[in-house]
UniProtKB/Swiss-Prot annotation:
This is DNA-directed RNA polymerase subunit beta. Transmembrane segments: none annotated. One of its GO terms (cellular component) is DNA-directed RNA polymerase complex. It comes from the Bacteria. It catalyses: RNA(n) + a ribonucleoside 5'-triphosphate = RNA(n+1) + diphosphate. One of its GO terms (molecular function) is DNA binding. The keyword Nucleotidyltransferase applies. Its EC number is 2.7.7.6.
Amino acid sequence: MSSAGGSSGPGYVLNDFDAVPRLSYAKSIDIRDSLTDLIRIQRDSYDAFIGIDRDGSSGIQSIFEAMFPIRDLLGRAVLEFVGYNIGEPQYDEYECIKRGITFSVPIRITLRFVVWKVQEVSFKEVKYVVDEDTSERSVKYMKEQEVSIGDLPMMTSYGTFIINGIERVIVSQMHRSPGVFFDSDKGKTYSSGKLIYSARVIPYRGSWLDFEFDIKDIIYFRIDKKRKLPVSYLLKALGMSNNDILDAFYDKVIYTRCDKGWRVPFIVDRFKGVRLSYDLMDVDGSVLVKANTRITLRIAKKLYADGLREYMVPFSGITGMFVAADLVDPSSGAVIVSAGETITSEHIVKLELFDISEIAFLNIDFLTVGPYVLNTLFLDKNMTQEDALFEIYRVLRSGESPNLDAVKSFFKGLFFESERYDLSVVGRIKLNSHLGLDVDENTTVLTKEDIVQVVKKLVLLRDGEGVVDDIDHLGNRRVRSVGEFIENQFRIGILRLERMIMDYMSSVNFDNAMPCDFVNPKVLATVLKDFFSSSQLSQFMDQTNPLSEVTHKRRLSALGPGGLTRERAGFEVRDVHPTHYGRICPIETPEGQNIGLISSLAIYAKINKYGFIESPYRKVENRVVTDKVEYLLAMQEGDYYIADAGAAIDENNRFVDDMLYCRHGGNFVMVKSEDVDYVDVSPKQIVSVAASLIPFLENNDANRALMGSNMQRQAVPLLKSEAPLVGTGMEFVVAAGSGAVVLAKRDGIVHRVDGSYIVIRAFDANKDECLGVDIYRLRKFQRSNHNTCINQRPVVKLGDYVKANDVIADGSAIDRGELALGKNVLVAFMSWQGYNFEDSIVISSDVVKRDVFTSIHIEEFECVVRDTPLGPEKIMRSVPDVNEESLSHLDDVGIVNIGAEVSASSILVGKVTPRPPVSLPPETKLLVTIFGEKVFDCVDSSLYLPPDVEGTVIDVHVFVRRGVEENDRSLLIKQSEISSFVKERDYEIDVVSEYFHDELRKLLRNAGVKVKGYSDLDSFFAEASDDTLWSTGLADAKVAAKVKDMRERFDSIVGEAHRKFEQKVDKLNYGYDLPQGVLTIVKVFVAVKHNLQPGDKMAGRHGNKGVISRIVPAEDMPHLEDGTPVDIILNSLGVPSRMNIGQILETHLGWAAVNLGKKIGRILDKGGPSMIADLRDFLDKIYDGQKLKSDIASMSSEALLVFANRLRKGVPMAAPVFEGPKDAQISKLLELAEVDPSGQVYLYDGRLGKKFDRKITVGYIYMLKLHHLVDDKIHARSVGPYGLVTQQPLGGKSHFGGQRFGEMECWALQAYGAAYTLQEMLTVKSDDIVGRVKIYESIIKGDSNFECGIPESFNVMIKELRSLCLNVVLKQDKEFTSGEVE
């Protein structure tokens, strides 16, 4: 039974470990299967890289295949790749965190080194010895070996990486997809407002290629944003002649000479809005349209329909037209008119003279087709291919003068060789679809046709055809996930390795070389380490609570390498785009300078293999909404009509309305229901995981919803978790997908359970067969990345039957498998003595007393014992100059005991460091002589607790360097760990043994085996030991064979358990590899209890945040008529201006939920024969219209009582996003609970006992305690560190700094005339070194007088003036006491 309220059929029973099903107001059908794995974005990407469930077409395999084989420069030998193998991690995830090491796996590759037999070697060629039988080169040596190339950080089961013992997350990056993009400057470049069009070809790897118009409509290109050149240079560098260029970009029109002029084909599209200077006549000479008459497209179509196919142009009518090809004198071969030239009156005379009968003209009409390419070509029409290549080379590599072959090779490498240029499959698909090409997807370099088509499309844009691309459209942006990042880093490492191998090959003696000699495993490890440690996208995981973990793994960032920078990103890229619908959450984003650049994946969205985000929709066929779910890309979605999930449908899933609002092409349109193609799968599919947890989200302003989403991630897990009474139904999904809970791997029965372990005997229910034992080790009081406490608690009990993926243990901020970030508290919206002014919060002391918002935080402190030049440091209890009382909580070794209460300046680890010998006074020398040993030869370097920490020691880890003698405490800790390993092994063996011996007894009983001396088998079984059972019944051959088979299976499982145990012990005994010079590391974990106090920040889920201003005694708080004091008072003025009305609706619904629970409690307390019937009747009214109603009807009386008792504290509600209950439904529930349907009640002043004048909104709201705790922010300084140069106290809590007394504060003292106070602030309390020593002496002596010296800042100023060659000297004498400047 899941907490989502699914039905379990007749005889329904609510398990103890299940949450109470919620009263849900959801109307749409939910596709829950898509939500089972919220971190699939991370896991799938990494699995694709390492080759899990992959055909080897990408990832590690493809990198190795691209790199190998590697040949030496002369071709004498070759290093071939055979295969690769990924090993097992040396330590598990928990052990890596504990040891502070990286969770990684070794990668080994099998290499084959082949050396050929050669006859002769020279710099020009190598002559090989050829095998006479095969006619192939003869092999001299062939050596194959498996070689380690380093360790690869492995992703944990939670989608994180453990790097140096710290959990990190690789954030996915949104970047512009490879391909071609067309854009315009939107008229901003020139004051005339003329649109300047441009195109950019972006590869995945390689040089960028830009095309652009200038103000004169000349087309230029740039490579890597260098100096621009005319595009004709690029086309000619590709080998195109002038005629080739004209043929590629312009259509030809053939003019044929006749007696009256030129006969021309009539093309309708050429006459759109044309005004001819001559009469339009047909070939017969009939005038169809008079000269200077404007011919519209309608007229042209009518002429064509009337049969006009050719028309006449007068001889002079071709003036100004562009010739498509050279016009040549037939007799002499001389060129009369060159291709691209315009016809003049002189040319017309020559054409008549040389009897030219047919001319091909370029179809340039200056309206639909412009002469842009032609004009560009004529900038330098005599340029050759070689000239163009050299010109391009000079722009990119200025200052070099290479030969033609080098230039050609360089140009080819820019765009046409896969080693230097890679469009990627995504880029090729985008290029093909954009330009209408049909190039193979595996061709990931540019072709000549690609470049020509890009220029063609750019010219068409200038001619007014088509539209520019929207770079913020999600069809033009893709996601790079963790697998792709690691693959790129892996490729970089392997390329470095390849260069090293080639260098080594040029100098090594092949006769003695082995494959392992060529490979340096540190190369790849260094590249991967740099990425995981220092990349902007490799981030310290937000581990405040389970929601913050999930959100961090689903985050999308536009920042990072290859992405945007926050300073240059404009409004457009940050804004919400229509294609974000169902793909990227429009709500959840940071509030600061990263707003819009960092976002979150929507709930149902997934990323396809090309990196584009897809959103699911239900298919509609003939007005019927089917259950078929299809995922659409942003570029596909615009072509369809997609209805909202809230569209009304009948019982047959047919649309009720004939007309529906749909999304189409980024707009909302009204269409017939027959034309609808798809419908949204759920109203909440547009929001992220965090936003989907906010009930009544639709009633909140978007800015407050954003704050609510972000602040849920800052909620600290509390001492006792409590699920919200008013939720959204997503709580269970988030908890299960976060990894904070423990889910059962297989079906089975709980065999053993305690605070640290759950042991489940897994079995196949159909075959009644034991499949093995699943042992779950729970995380107990572990420290998270943000110092919050991770603690898992079992929710199952002995004998419970669990199914796969059932929640068997809760984690931090989890309540029976549901996310529980805060507490349900009784709230009143009113003012109270001004203490809730400006969002301040008033809290009842009863809340503090009951530890409602108390949280546990775990601090880690580390003590490092080093080997110094004077000798090793030592951990010891007898620390010099420390009294015995301060050492009382240390053990004999000198390490604090677990369970000790420690406070500021308590010693956690006693440690002494050797110091150089000093000259001793006579009395000390006497002691040394008497006792025969040195004294005071070491100094106290113990680990002390910082001044702002107070708590309980809950754990101690001691790591001793391998080879160094272990102390008693480390041996004790090791023995404790071995005991836990023994416990795990014995648990597994006990379960298996019990199952097999039960099966053995069944076998012997069914076979009718007789045992001598016993009348029946039961008496024998009662006395016989387990070992005796195995030797019973062996006289029967059939029974003996079955017993033997069973024994072999039993021994195999037990042997495996012993093997795993020995492996763990061996790893523990292996010791620890510590940094150079470190002998021992001691880590002490202190649990700090944080009670709620003034200054702590609290918030609801609707962006209603505030700071606690006062904790009022419970007896003084306003109370209800029955005397119940409210827990929290919020300012009602904080609601209207913020427009987050969701908190009021939540308060009303929570009030209804609790009062319904109270009414159920009254029915239970009343008892009587009609109690069960009354309960059923009341629950039917509550769950009217819910699926759960039929389950309640099928419950037995006992099950119903259990269910009803769980509802005493309140009936859990679910108000899904965009599907929350309306005010009429809430009023109905309030009436059912027998309270005022307005949701308001009279309150009484707790101090005076008087009733307030009017009713007040009272109810239950879910409040969170955020990690902005006052204990972590406020501090006080008496004496502390000073700055080295200014000698002023440092600032900030981390430096134990003081409060800055700034310029304006000085003005305040001046205004009050407090001269001495001002002098004190500016001198002895700040940077007067001499003065503060004197005032200290005065305090010691009890004297109240003090003298001020010169502040150090004045001396710093003098030094700075001197650095400017201005010598300032301060002079003092009897007559002249002020400063004089020389």
